[in-house]
């Protein structure tokens, strides 16, 4: 199982586009668990700090931040997912 954490906040202008792309990429992939992390919550702040997160939107895969900021492409995300599958 691959765990993807999607870091976002309600004032980020790029987060909706990142979420849309992420949703499309992982649609139909049965080995993915998606966790939405709102960095405007205490829990989200704590998790972001634990990963040394500097910006949103961001995507962590299996506990490692792989993509930060916008834009990123579907190919970038798929490459990160495939890398996680190989481990």
Task: Show the residue positions of the predicted features.
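Thiol-based oxidoreductase modules, predominantly thioredoxin-like and allied folds used
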Residues: 31-44
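Glycine-/small-residue-rich active-site loops that bind phosphorylated ligands and cofactors
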Residues: 13-14, 40, 66
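Non-catalytic, surface beta->alpha helical segment in thiol-disulfide oxidoreductase systems
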Residues: 61-87
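Short acidic active-site motifs
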Residues: 43-47, 76
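Structural micro-motif
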Residues: 49-60
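Local sequence-structure signature of Cys/Sec-based thiol-disulfide redox active-site neighborhoods
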Residues: 1-28
